[in-house]
């Protein structure tokens, strides 16, 4: 990062994958401790293996996780460490509140069918994973003063995990977990995979907040399904919502929150590479409710400042717009009302705004 960040004030981040934000040095450390051999031994070499620097396909991007997830998954110390270090990283980026998402099943090695990352069976269940991440986040918050909460992900290709995910959301509802998410291949719709619909219905019944990856690479119909069938309160990405103007207008009217990830959207091929033609420009023009987020900073070799710089440089974002979108992020976050109020007050104070200032 050269010089001053694009927005040097407190920020809120709502869409970042914990397992897409792991320090590569940590991967090397843990591999050494666990006696896991990697094809490379230097951080720079591992970076070359794990990052996407030019627009790729979503499949190529997802393939990057297989280079390091097997090192972290199924190891108590490692899972807690990545959570703790995540909070440290976010604090350095000026984030005062972050919602990190992950699939508890992808970090477990017991009670998961099939076992991910070709692991041997062990003793860490998805339930243990949530507990370990919570510990790391709590210690991180004490050390770095940045508050982190979890969103647990269902995976589109694993509908048989989804009911377990919602049960974990319920179990840890008062302990660090604020919502449920659905991630993965958008072509796998909920009609064909009813496990997700069932889980999200249970989430609605149990007052578990809901966000859904939709309209990232998939069409606007996936966004409609997320809102109408899964009762999503926020949309992860949602760029392709613009292809259905009626839906877009309806969601604008409903003040639906869109978790925007500009750097990610270019590198996964979700949007065309030219940032000056990005859908976010339309969302900004229409004063939509959205946030700026990194998504998977390790894989994109980015920080939150990268996203702020990109929109400042190519989409004419101003300091005022940065304030507006962070206030919107805080208003749309999944914290309990009292904590949300406190977060908003922190932002109003830091931004020199009176509480009544409305955008």
Swiss-Prot record:
A GO-annotated cellular component: external side of plasma membrane
InterPro entries: A/AMP_deam_AS, A_deaminase, A_deaminase_dom, Ado/ade_deaminase, Metal_Hydrolase
Catalytic residues (positions): 216 (proton donor)
Subcellular location: Cell membrane; Cell junction; Cytoplasmic vesicle lumen; Cytoplasm
GO MF entries: 2'-deoxyadenosine deaminase activity; adenosine deaminase activity; zinc ion binding
Gene3D superfamilies in alphabetical order: Metal-dependent hydrolases
Major subcellular site: membrane
Broad class of enzyme this protein falls into: hydrolase
Cofactor requirements of the protein: Zn(2+)
Keywords (A to Z) from UniProt: Cell junction, Cell membrane, Cytoplasm, Cytoplasmic vesicle, Hydrolase, Lysosome, Membrane, Metal-binding, Nucleotide metabolism, Zinc
Site (Important for catalytic activity): 237
Binding site for substrate: 17, 19, 184, 296
Catalytic activity: adenosine + H2O + H(+) = inosine + NH4(+); 2'-deoxyadenosine + H2O + H(+) = 2'-deoxyinosine + NH4(+)
EC number: 3.5.4.4
Function: Catalyzes the hydrolytic deamination of adenosine and 2-deoxyadenosine. Plays an important role in purine metabolism and in adenosine homeostasis. Modulates signaling by extracellular adenosine, and so contributes indirectly to cellular signaling events. May act as a positive regulator of T-cell coactivation.
Assigned protein family: Belongs to the metallo-dependent hydrolases superfamily. Adenosine and AMP deaminases family.
Protein name, UniProt field: Adenosine deaminase
Native source species: Danio rerio
